């Protein structure tokens, strides 16, 4: 992430997601304490990181705050090792003209690199590189898994529609390009996957709107697919897989990025477009 930011002497950096303090340590050693601010919502993490940094003689500014809320100061670089959706407007507000923002989009592996534009937004591209980080938090605890019970409910349920899928069952969470594209075009889907000792694969998909899908088959067979709710989630997935086969790749990586001052991300590559908003 720091490499994509093109950090050099003299820049001031906001490190979003202090964590253990490793990133802040690298930055402070390279740039000096007075040019590094690191922010994290978790007071335990910021306290522990500050103590670790003190032991090695480094004292960057460590702030305990919600990084998606109001921020102070001005920075030439903002590098986030947490993921967001959309981009917090406060990041754009504290980014100096021409400054660079590097972050990942929540629940994807896409890295957005964008430079501040005169209108208060930013422009750049989705890198060919990949990374994934936990989503930003807004309180003291990690959010509960609200859809866990749904997986149990649909494991043996008969679908409103039962069909045979076009392609073998895939573990979407491990197919990074596929999962990221699906999250951009149909955000909020959760996945579960299992393969038994005989090679039978089962994949479950659920969405907060009540849509769900279950696909089961041996490793390289076309699966039986049960689907229910307002949308056909497995059909969405199959359309993305078909596009990748027909065109050789998906248009997400390498796409141009335009971020409006309110943090909404607009993607474009060729005739393909997408919007990443709240």
Language-model regions, residue ranges each:
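C-terminal terminal segments
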Residues: 174-231
């Amino acid at each position: 992430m720091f490499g994509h930011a093109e950090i050099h002497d003299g820049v001031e950096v906001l490190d979003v997601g202090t964590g253990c303090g490793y990133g802040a340590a690298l930055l402070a050693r390279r740039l000096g304490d007075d040019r590094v601010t690191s922010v994290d919502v978790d007071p335990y993490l910021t306290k522990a990181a500050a103590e670790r940094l003190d032991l090695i003689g480094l004292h960057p500014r460590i702030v305990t705050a919600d990084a998606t809320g109001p921020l102070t100061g001005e920075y030439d670089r903002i590098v986030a090792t947490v993921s967001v959706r959309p981009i917090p407007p406060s990041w754009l507000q504290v980014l100096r003209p021409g400054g660079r923002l590097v972050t990942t989009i929540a629940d994807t592996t896409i890295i957005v690199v964008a430079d501040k534009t005169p209108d208060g937004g930013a422009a750049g591209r989705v890198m060919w590189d990949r990374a994934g980080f936990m989503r930003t938090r807004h309180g003291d605890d990690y959010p509960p898994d609200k859809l866990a019970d749904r997986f149990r409910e649909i494991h043996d349920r008969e679908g409103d529609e039962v069909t045979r899928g076009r392609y073998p069952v895939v573990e979407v969470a491990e197919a990074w390009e596929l999962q990221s594209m699906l999250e951009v075009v149909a955000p909020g889907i959760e996945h579960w996957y299992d393969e038994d000792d005989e090679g039978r694969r089962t994949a479950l998909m659920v969405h907060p709107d009540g849509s769900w899908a279950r696909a089961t088959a041996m490793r390289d067979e076309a699966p039986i697919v049960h689907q229910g709710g307002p949308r056909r989630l497995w059909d969405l997935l199959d359309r993305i897989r078909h596009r990748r086969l027909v065109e050789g790749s998906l248009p997400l990586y390498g796409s141009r990025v335009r971020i409006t001052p309110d943090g909404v991300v607009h993607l474009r590559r060729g005739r393909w477009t997408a919007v990443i908003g709240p």
